[in-house]
Amino acid sequence: MATASGPAGIAMGSVGSLLERQDFSPEELRAALAGSRGSRQPDGLLRKGLGQREFFSYLHLPKKDGKTAKRAPRNEPDYTTLYYREHPRAGDFSKTSLPERGRFDKCRIRPSVFKPPVSTGKGFLSMQSLAAHKGQKLWRSNGSLHTLACHPPLSPGPRASQARAQLLHALSLDEGGPEPSLSDSSSGGSFGRSPGTGPSPFSSSLGHINHLGGSLDRASRSPKESGPLAVLSCLPEPPPPYEFSCPTTEEVAVLPDTCEELKRDLGDQDVSNPFTQVLEERQRLWLSELKRLYVDRLHEVAQKAERSERNLQLQLFMAQQEQRRLRKELRAQQGLAPEPRTSGPPMEADPNARPEEEARWEVCQKTAEISLLKQQLREAQAELAQKLAEIFSLKTQLRGSRAQAQAQDAELARLREAVRSLQEQAPREEAPGSCETDDCKSRGLLGEAGGNEAREGAEQLRAELLQERLRGQEQALRFEQERQTWQEEKERVLRYQREIQGSYMDMYRRNQALEQELRVLREPPTSWSPRLESSKI
């Protein structure tokens, strides 16, 4: 064991002289925490942190004065008194206490970095709630465990309280105790979580950060102070606050966002900062864990897909077997022969019998021809309907022209009668011309002028009547030509329909013959049945 001289010139003793073993022996710690390590929750999972009862049993361990009297001689110096003489503010953890220079100078992390990402509900129990139940608030000290150890209501006695404060303070100086926010976040992640949620990823990594902080703190101390702390560094580590358990999928999904937040918070610090290196290492570990979880999930999904594919193939095979069975039953009910097996030796084909495939091909070809003829028949019927509509319109026009011609003939007859009456009146007026006076001559001249006008009107009417007759004759001739044309078209369409009907009958007979041949080909040949020859198509 290493020894060092104190300020009073007294040599350092063993570790047992500095610690009160009746309070903090490793066997008693293991016995007090034995129930919390191997305990399980009602659902079969491991409990992730210490309960309230285990924690108080950890703080209030029973004293064993007999073992202390046997192990430590009475002539040993009182190192507690010497420690408080040398460090008058070692156990002062009040609100106004400030850390001494050189003893607490180490790289700190901001309190907002390691806050728990998920807040818990009713079961939240932190170190501050345990220590401040009397209304006293904890200030930013070197850890909530230190404050709990030095709190008057929780300490069993003044001497034990001083020894516990001395031990915890020395351990915090040697191991680099975390910040209050760091300790609170770790304790909140350990004690305040419900059984359903996993441990916080930051509380599981605080041991590495504290270890680095303690190394930096030891480097900044003086050789005089590093002696007793080197002795205390050989002590066994306290039990872990919770047992390790695999992180859940939700926590693993939150890890990249947490890493980004830590990078932003620590961006103003130096790259060579050990905390930054530790956090980067934790980030790499988290990413590898995330990839592993993703690979496992993909493997599981692939296995499920493979199993479902095998099940579907099995169901498809069963459906095919059922379909074959149903076909056989249907064929047996219809009285047809079963399908020839392809696995057996091929039967010799009859050279005189027509192949079934050729007969089927001919049937398909004739069916196509029938459909083409049907299409042509529909087109001819549509054209015939159009021609009939045109004939009806021409007949209507002819009827109108005939009525107009009759009206013109009646007008012409009336004009002829008027001209004849005028011609009969003219000689009567010319006979007594000798005895007429000048007045009569003048009247005769007027009548002659009126007769000339009537003759001109009659000639004009004759010319118009002649034109109308010629026009009527021309229309009648044109109508007769159209009638003859439509009669020829009608005869042609009727002849075409008769031909199509005859072709339909021929096609029907051919189809009947082909069906008979197919029926003969499908039936097994017998010795007594005559062979049917196919008719020529």
Curated annotation (Swiss-Prot):
Subunit-structure text: Binds NEDD4. Interacts with 14-3-3 proteins. Interacts with MAVS.
InterPro entries, A to Z: N4BP3 (IPR033571)
Species for this entry: Rattus norvegicus (Rat)
Cellular component per GO, a single term: cytoplasmic vesicle
Coiled coil regions, renumbered to chain: 295-523
Protein name: Nedd4 binding protein 3
Region feature Disordered, mapped onto this chain: 173-234, 327-359, 422-456
Principal subcellular localisation of the protein: cytoplasm
